[in-house]
């Protein structure tokens, strides 16, 4: 329910119309995570390094949000909406695979991210990540050592009334015989934030509470989650 800790292979399906994703992951966030979810027995200093990575990512996040505020000429609206932001970092392992695949099965299916922006570190140089342009054409994302990919998320698309469009992306089965690792940092507003049109154009979306939207999207991705109004309030 809290989208934290270890997620087994096949637990998530970001494209509900396709077979389950071929990955396992570990999620942690910038708030206090329950101690029993940390892998202390396997990696003793993992929690310290994970929390340091959150601090670095959050600093970069504020710099990027400030740039968006400037572009949109909306003061400090986005920075202010993330003063107590609820961010989740995910370490993803796409195992090497030699067997047969189901029709349309990918390492991770076509999807957009749910929050404001996502910072993505590609950990090793194994191809597969693709992004879709506005014309529907897919393009491979090259590996850049120490580089960060910045994806627009669904909430920023709603905030900007489609001025910025959420990035559709996927990980295809190129080099599926090799393990692939990545680390996305998902940026979400302070829980309780109402996301509404910041532009002067007619509204394309109804205002929505940020965590309500997040929980709704997560419920679609995880076969084991059932969306309820109670879950959105936790």
Residue positions per predicted region:
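Conserved double-stranded beta-helix
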Residues: 25-34, 56-129, 172
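Fe(II)/2-oxoglutarate oxygenase catalytic core
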Residues: 1-37, 44-83, 141-144, 175-185, ...
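Catalytic core of Fe(II)/2-oxoglutarate
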Residues: 105, 121-211
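Residue-level signal for pocket-adjacent positions within structured domains
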Residues: 1, 21, 33, 37, ...
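Active-site-adjacent structural patch at catalytic or cofactor/ligand-binding sites
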Residues: 20, 113-115, 149-150
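Conserved small/polar residues in nucleotide/adenosyl-binding loops
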Residues: 227-233
